[in-house]
Amino acid sequence: MKLSRKILKFTEPLTYRRGWRRAQRSIFRVPLRPMLAKIDEARVREIRQRYANSTAGYAKYANIEPWLRLNRERVQDLKLHRSEPKRVLDLGCGGGFFLFIARNLGHSVLGVDIEHVALFTELLELFRVPRVVWRISAFEPLPDLGQKFDWITAFSTNFYLYHPTKERWGTAEWDFFLGDLQQHLVPGGKIFFGLNPLYSGDYYTPELRDLFISRGADVERERIFFENGLSF
């Protein structure tokens, strides 16, 4: 690519934002080695070896270091490594990689997910990350979690799919869900979603994008960020 085209591309808002986040990660680093030193190395090795030849899609998570590196970036992008202690709720927490890093940075953490993959339960125990077992469903509120949160996050989850059809929630389902999440946020709390793409490659319909924006979100491709809470 010619230099002029590279410069032009970097001046595009999306490219600039993503480049700035990468630069911030390199400046404000989060070492993983001290965190890894706190967990049972023999247990890590045993889990990895046991799933090494598994053909199950989830078996990839038994090799924990790539997923810790990915979730370190998520923590850095939300600036949780530069924040005073917060209460963090992660929806669809899986094996707890994101919350493990957040907890090691001094935050109080809680995950919500269904109990359908034994590996995830093993990893949560390894990381000492607490989880509430709960299936998130359309038009159903979350349970009483005993506290309100400064942050509610969700990364690459599938709770907004109807099963088994895989049909995605529409604006009515999402609006109910956002209204319910507001009940679990402290005043001024933040919500971040990292969405999976549709089969078309888009992340949401135009109507859903408009809903997110109307409720106060900054929308950047898969990133839906309610930095100042929700507007109803």
Question: Model-predicted segments: where are they?
Answer:
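Conserved SAM-binding loop of SAM-dependent methyltransferases across substrates and taxa
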Residues: G95-L105
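Conserved SAM-binding strand-loop segment of SAM-dependent methyltransferases
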Residues: R128-A138
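Conserved alpha-helix/loop element of class I SAM-dependent methyltransferases that forms part
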Residues: E65-P85
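A short glycine-rich, Lys/Arg-flanked "PGG" loop and its adjoining helix->strand segment in the class I
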Residues: R168-P187
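A short SAM/SAH-binding and catalytic strip from SAM-dependent methyltransferases
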Residues: W151-T171
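A short acidic, Gly/Pro-enriched loop at the edge of an enzyme's catalytic core
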Residues: L142-I152
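Conserved class I S-adenosyl-L-methionine
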Residues: P85-G94
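Conserved beta-strand signature within the Rossmann-like core of class I S-adenosyl-L-methionine
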Residues: G188-L195
